[in-house]
Amino acid sequence: MASENMTPQDYIGHHLNNLQMDLRTFSLVDPHNPPATFWTLNIDSMFFSVVLGLLFLVMFRSVAKKATSGVPGKFQTAIELIVGFVHGSVKDMYHGKSKLIAPLALTIFVWVFLMNLMDLLPIDLLPYIAEHWLGLPATRVVPSADVNITLSMALGVFILILFYSIKMKGIGGFAKELTLQPFNHWAFIPVNLILEGVSLLSKPVSLGLRLFGNMYAGELIFILIAGLLPWWSQWILNVPWAIFHILIITLQAFIFMVLTIVYLSMASEEH
């Protein structure tokens, strides 16, 4: 429900502001007067992403410790289904040999899903608690709606792409891949380098921006519904959108995982 002291425009803008720290002074940034500097840290995005990552570790560790060969409980069954699904996806799509890929894919899928799931919380719940109980000027609770988080994850995948490319093909083989494809002639090396360089760099950029764009749009729709409609009518649009958004949340986590597996499989192929 929008604050009585805010116009709809103020309400929407308020919910799109991150809790930021100026790294030059280590002080909180005024969301209404942000500094014109790159050196800021989105504390809320970092906090919720770390907390959700720890939640993932605690959940899976507790299930692993209590796993039995007998009849599993409902929670253990759900975890086993997720693990089996991810393992099957890796087996079908990754053609190299690495023990890292399956755990990485599982971590990405569950972690991104949990970050996306924060979008289903009531839009004012955690920001209200943060503002009135903790005195924080702004709070955004969906880490995957922050481009810094999604591009950071994509950058991690990009580093792994480079690592596996060099590991499987060697530095010379990787250099040849960049300079002698698609035109296998020394005269086309500059053209090949531009084409392959753009293709290589587009992978992390598209990976991060796709997740960010979908989650930012979903978050914005919830904010628009809450900011423009009276409280008693919001459920008419909120409920159908939340139900549909469950599909988006799961699908975006799956796409991020699948593209990571595919990119690493391509990097692991020997030419």
UniProtKB/Swiss-Prot annotation:
It is found in: Cell inner membrane. Pfam families: ATP-synt_A. The chain crosses the membrane at residues 38-58, 100-120, 146-166, 220-240, 242-262. GO terms for molecular function: proton-transporting ATP synthase activity, rotational mechanism. Keywords: ATP synthesis, Cell inner membrane, Cell membrane, CF(0), Hydrogen ion transport, Ion transport, Membrane, Transmembrane, Transmembrane helix, Transport. The keyword Lyase does not apply. F-type ATPases have 2 components, CF(1) - the catalytic core - and CF(0) - the membrane proton channel. CF(1) has five subunits: alpha(3), beta(3), gamma(1), delta(1), epsilon(1). CF(0) has three main subunits: a(1), b(2) and c(9-12). The alpha and beta chains form an alternating ring which encloses part of the gamma chain. CF(1) is attached to CF(0) by a central stalk formed by the gamma and epsilon chains, while a peripheral stalk is formed by the delta and b chains. Belongs to the ATPase A chain family. PANTHER family: ATP SYNTHASE SUBUNIT A, CHLOROPLASTIC (PTHR42823:SF3). This is ATP synthase subunit a. The gene is atpB.
